């Protein structure tokens, strides 16, 4: 659920940037480049949780995974997506590594939220939103997305068959079995 900057290039296209850090927000503190933000689902505010990389080298003993606001100690619930409070959508260019010399990037639609930083307004999204965009999950916001498992779109079961020789039906069946096992074991699934 960490926030990632979405940056506009000179040609007008958008690309994922780096994580939104404490330094971006103008905070002058030790290891500020490694204190990353999430959206707290309870308040809608952006906060730094315990356990970021900076805490590993900190003296404050907050190198843990408790869902707490690092600054206040208040309990937080990191929001997976900016979908519910998005200020818009943009199409991002994502690197494509699928053996196609003609196609080097994938264009995907992405929900974004505007955040005021020390250097002005920037667009952010979550790692989760980027993952969904990369895998062409159709969220009804446009872009190149897969309408079904049978679409020959990068990362779908139909697409992978030409690279692996594994039938799409088998991939779908296996994925459903893993998901079913995860439900039955409360997430204690190994692949």
Predicted regions and their residues:
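Long, well-ordered, tryptophan-enriched scaffold segments
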Residues: 1-185
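Gly/His-enriched, cation/cofactor- and phosphate-binding structural elements
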Residues: 90, 190-191
